[in-house]
Structure formats: C-alpha cells, structure tokens
C-alpha cells in the first residue's frame, strides 16, 4: 500500500471569547466596562523535516486541530493565544486543497514552514464597544472559528538519481549493491511498492542520493497498474538511470523495454523524457545479455544515450556508471528559486456575499457574513442590534430591497432568521 498520498483534515484553533465585565472598585463610582479580549486560536503549521521520507504517519492519524485561544478576563485581561499545532512533513510534500485540487504549497527545503489553517481571531471584550452614547455595553464578541479544510498531501521523493525500468529489471539489486539501502528483492512484478532511498558514497567527499522508483509498466501514465503513484516519484530527480534486463529473462526485448518506459515518462510529463539519462544494461553475467549488448548499445548510442554494461549478481561495471551519474549531477542547473519566505500562509480569497430567495425566504451567504454571525452574542439585544447595523452599513439591506425584498419578509443568515424592517435599529 502506498504512503506517498494522504488525505487529512486540519482546523485552526477557535478564538477565545471576549469578557463581559464591569469595573467595580472603591473610589471608582462609575467604573465602566472592563472586559478583556479573547486570545487568538493556534495555527496548524507544516514544517519540513529532512529526517522523514514517507507520509506513513498520516495513515494512522488524519484529524489535526490546533488549540483554541483562552477567553478574555476581567480587568481588561487578554486571553492567551492558543498553541500552534506543528506537523512535520518530509521534503518534497505537495499540499493541495482536497475540494478544488489547487496546489497550496510545495514544501522542499528543510525547515520550510507553511500555515495550512489559521486560528480564529479572539473576540473583543465589552470595553471595546463603549461609545459616548453607550458607556457601559453589556455584550462581547465570541471568538472567530478557526479555518478548517481537508488537504491532499502528495510526496515526491527528493533524490539526485532515480532508477527507472520494468519490474524485475534489477533496480533493487543494483541499489542494495551500491548503497546501504536494503529494499525487498524477489522475482515478481511490483516488488518495490514504495520508493527506497540510498546514499552512494564515491569517496573524497563525493556522494549522492539514489532512489529505487517502483517498477513501471505500459500504460502507467494512464494509471494502469500503479502508474500514477510510481511516476509521481520521478519528477524531482536530477538524473535518471534506466535499468534494462539485458538478458530479456521475462521474454521481452531490452530495446523494446526502453522505448515503453521512455514513452510512459514522456506521456506523463514531457520534461521527464528530456532529463539526463544513463542506461544500465543489467544481467551481463547471463549469455543472452552479452549477445544483446552490441545491438542495443548501437541503437541507443545513436539516440544520444550512454550505455553501461553491469551485473547485479557479480557487481561488475558499477563504478563507471556511478561516476558518470555524479558528473551529470554536478552539471545540473537548479531552477531559479523564488524569494525565500520565513513562513508561508495560505489565505483563501474572500468572495464577498450573495443574496437569493428560496422557499419564500431570503438567504444571505458569504464568508464575511458567516464570520460575523459566529462572533455575535445572540442572547444579547445590544449585540443583535449591532449585527443588524453592520449589515446595513455593508449594504446588505439595500441589496435585499433592490432584489425585491419587502418589509416583513423573512431573511436567513446561516441559522439565524429575522424580519426585514424599515425603521433603523
């Protein structure tokens, strides 16, 4: 089962509510309001941890919620901010909105931080609403709900070299021979179901990371077999080593195998087919491979590919191939990086509000209006009057009347219903 794709739910902490407090002290006969503000809710933050290389942890835990802010207190005391919930993810994690498929973040660099769900603002205490005409208001704001969304995480292995080829071409054997990685090795398709990383040490401080990309089959770019999952891992490698079964032990021709995999890479992402590629002609310990080598080498070298005969069984021919791969890595020119950000924050666009009539009731919808509803103290007449006054200032009442609403019509905002009235509140 793949662990390079995960679907999780994240929610920022709700803001703490404000306080409804009155100052009562000796020698302060007209103390007035003294309620403090609530604290902001904690954020849900992704941090890139270079020590991770899978999304397996998200297989067992899928719901993440940051701490809410503390409520405001008397004497103008401000509630404490909720703790941020920090979630570690491996380098190469792509964060998408599960509903829209929009890419929110592409997390590659160690220590990179991204806020995926912001905490809600703390509600204001009653001292914030004092005016010359209302010197001691009796209401406060509730805390703003934290942002919540479902995310789709995709992991693209970050490696210098990717091994591609048909199942059973000998990639896992090659990787275990040139590094300390120990992939599962057996004679059947899809032996490797997740990428296996290894470090190749050439000495003198020269090393690189190599990844055994799970085996490909014809039609992989259309999702045949486990194609999309496999191809996703290839995209960030700098160099490809195409491992061929030179002996054709599965009854296939090595040159035909090369063309099939090359075409799958090109169909999935044309840039992959143009990536620097070396050909490892494997299983040279078998007579059929030695017989096929001249024909395959001539055909591929005419197309610009360097062919290296190797044997996973005897470990012959590895050094020249690895040296050539290292040289290509050094020649690789990284894309121009974007200006670094200490912390990236996803801020969804506010879409305003809309009005429509359904079942004889006028409905008002919109993130801004929903936030106002959630933070209003509905059990308090002063707070309700403030809510209606804000709707009027935002032009909602005028828009309702222009749409055909009349006095006495029912207006519904979220779960709250009221009658449209001509007289100002």
Swiss-Prot record:
GO molecular function: GTP binding; GTPase activity; magnesium ion binding
Keyword list, A-Z: Cytoplasm, GTP-binding, Hydrolase, Magnesium, Metal-binding, Nucleotide-binding
Annotated organism of origin: Symbiobacterium thermophilum (strain DSM 24528 / JCM 14929 / IAM 14863 / T)
Family matches, as InterPro entries: G_OBG (IPR031167), GTP-bd (IPR006073), GTP-bd_Obg/CgtA (IPR014100), GTP-bd_prot_GTP1/OBG_C_sf (IPR036346), GTP1-OBG_CS (IPR006074), GTP1_OBG_dom (IPR006169), GTP1_OBG_dom_sf (IPR036726), OBG_GTPase (IPR045086)
Family annotation (SUPFAM superfamilies): Obg GTP-binding protein C-terminal domain, Obg GTP-binding protein N-terminal domain, P-loop containing nucleoside triphosphate hydrolases
Cellular component aspect of the GO annotation: cytoplasm
Cofactor(s) listed: Mg(2+)
Binding site for GTP: 165-172, 190-194, 212-215, 282-285, 311-313
Function: An essential GTPase which binds GTP, GDP and possibly (p)ppGpp with moderate affinity, with high nucleotide exchange rates and a fairly low GTP hydrolysis rate. Plays a role in control of the cell cycle, stress response, ribosome biogenesis and in those bacteria that undergo differentiation, in morphogenesis control.
Pfam families xref list: DUF1967 (PF09269), GTP1_OBG (PF01018), MMR_HSR1 (PF01926)
Enzyme Commission code: 3.6.5.-
Principal localisation: cytoplasm
Segments forming domain Obg: 1-158
Domain OBG-type G: 159-330
Subunit-level organization: Monomer.
Name of the protein this chain belongs to: GTPase Obg
Places the protein is found: Cytoplasm
Sequence similarity: Belongs to the TRAFAC class OBG-HflX-like GTPase superfamily. OBG GTPase family.
OCT domain segment(s): 345-422
């Amino acid at each position: 089962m793949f662990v390079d794709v995960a679907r999780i739910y994240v929610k920022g902490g709700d803001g703490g509510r404000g306080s409804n407090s009155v100052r009562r002290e000796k020698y302060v006969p007209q103390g007035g309001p003294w309620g403090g503000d609530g604290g902001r809710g904690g954020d849900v933050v992704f941090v890139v941890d270079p020590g991770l290389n899978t999304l397996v942890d998200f297989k067992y835990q899928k719901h993440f919620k940051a701490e809410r802010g503390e409520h405001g207190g008397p004497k103008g005391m401000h509630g404490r901010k909720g703790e941020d919930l920090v979630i570690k993810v491996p380098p190469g994690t792509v964060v998408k909105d599960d509903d829209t498929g929009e890419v929110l973040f592409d997390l590659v660099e160690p220590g990179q931080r991204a806020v995926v769900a912001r905490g809600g603002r703390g509600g204001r205490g009653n001292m914030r609403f004092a005016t010359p005409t209302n010197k001691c208001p009796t209401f406060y704001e509730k805390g703003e709900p934290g942002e919540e969304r479902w995310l789709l995480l995709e992991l693209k292995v970050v490696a210098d070299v990717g091994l591609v080829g048909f199942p059973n071409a000998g990639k896992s054997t090659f990787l275990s021979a040139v590094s300390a990685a120990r992939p599962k090795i057996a004679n059947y398709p899809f032996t490797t179901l997740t990428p296996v990383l290894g470090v190749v040490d050439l000495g003198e401080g020269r090393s690189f990371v190599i990844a055994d990309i799970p085996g490909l089959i014809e039609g992989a770019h259309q999702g045949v077999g486990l194609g999309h999952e496999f191809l996703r891992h290839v995209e960030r490698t700098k160099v490809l080593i195409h491992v061929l079964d030179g002996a054709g032990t599965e009854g296939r021709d090595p040159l035909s195998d090369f063309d099939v995999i090359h075409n799958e890479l090109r169909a999935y992402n044309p840039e992959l087919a143009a990536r620097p590629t070396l050909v490892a002609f494997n299983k040279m310990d078998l007579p059929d491979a030695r017989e096929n080598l001249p024909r395959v080498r001539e055909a591929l070298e005419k197309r610009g590919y360097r062919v290296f005969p190797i044997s996973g069984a005897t470990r012959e021919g590895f050094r020249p191939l690895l040296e050539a791969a290292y040289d290509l890595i050094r020649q690789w020119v990284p894309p121009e990086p974007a200006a670094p950000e200490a912390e990236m924050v996803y801020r969804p666009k506010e879409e305003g509000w809309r009005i429509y009539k359904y079942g004889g009731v006028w409905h008002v919808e919109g993130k801004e209006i929903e936030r106002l509803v959630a933070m209003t103290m509905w059990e308090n007449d002063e707070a309700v009057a403030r809510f209606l006054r804000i709707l009027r200032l935002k032009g909602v009442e005028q828009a309702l009347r222009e749409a055909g609403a009349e006095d006495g019509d029912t207006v519904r905002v979220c779960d709250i219903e009221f009658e449209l009235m001509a007289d100002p509140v």
